[in-house]
Amino acid sequence: MTLSTSSSPASAASAASSAFAPIPLWRQLQATATVLVAIRAGQSATTALNGVETSLRPGVQALVFHVLRGLGQAEALRRKLANRTPPPPVDALLCIALALGWREERGDDGGLFYDPFTLVDQAVEAAKRNPATRPQASFINACLRRFLRERDALLEAVAGEPMATWNHPRWWIDRLRQDHPRRWRDILQANNTHAPMALRVNVQKVSQAQYLRTLDAMNIEAMPVGAFGILLDQARPVQDIPGFLDGQVSVQDAGAQMAAPLLLRGLDLSQPLHILDACAAPGGKTAHLLELAGAQAHAHVTALDIDPVRCERIHQNLDRLG
């Protein structure tokens, strides 16, 4: 097997913690607002998060994912609180606080829980410490305090808006209703649910059954999914996953684990394989191709990605997996 490359949540609360010193919430809110502005401008969340300071990234990633799941509701609330759309950095910070505020009360996805007044205080502090938002700090404070006073009435006022109800873009909701008239609500509801942490066993090193026995011996609850996958009952940091550092398993969504076997199923494995993975980072499917093809055929995989930073992850993952 050969490979050539070219450039190209544990829970949110635990992800937000630091091993050394507590990071003020206002700093995380600032960084989350910067990421949200980038996403609204067309960047992927992954690309935007790569620009976040390393010490802040785990907590900010948790906040970003949490906020995006509630962004439709937050934007609807902001429209009730402000007659005009504020400048992007201000709007991002306000919507983030609203998303965390209303979801804090519901707690419908096991997410973050902040005291509402602490959240307002830290959002205003974040605004004051950024020159781009400092002039609007009083505006943010007024909007958020009004939300606290009128929360029930405001939530009721936006309850009939599809984007507020489902936290998806309107075009997406309309398309799902058209394509899946009987199940569109179930699909949207599932999209708003935290995905379980899925692992893929490296069949060059361990079988699914063997790894499940390892987890059972360590009192880690898990269940098999598909031919190579394992769903953990509770997410955990990768360094705490047995065998992760030794390359026995990778973190990979169960759906993504279907790509490599589906491709190989349609190829003649009696012949040498030359495979192009044109969107390879961080290398999960590339590694899976090599793991499976290596047991059946000679495979040369060329892995490409447009992002040089993420392309480095391909090398790191392949080195770890061996």
Question: Where would I find each of the regions flagged by the language model?
Answer:
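S-adenosylmethionine
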Residues: 1-322
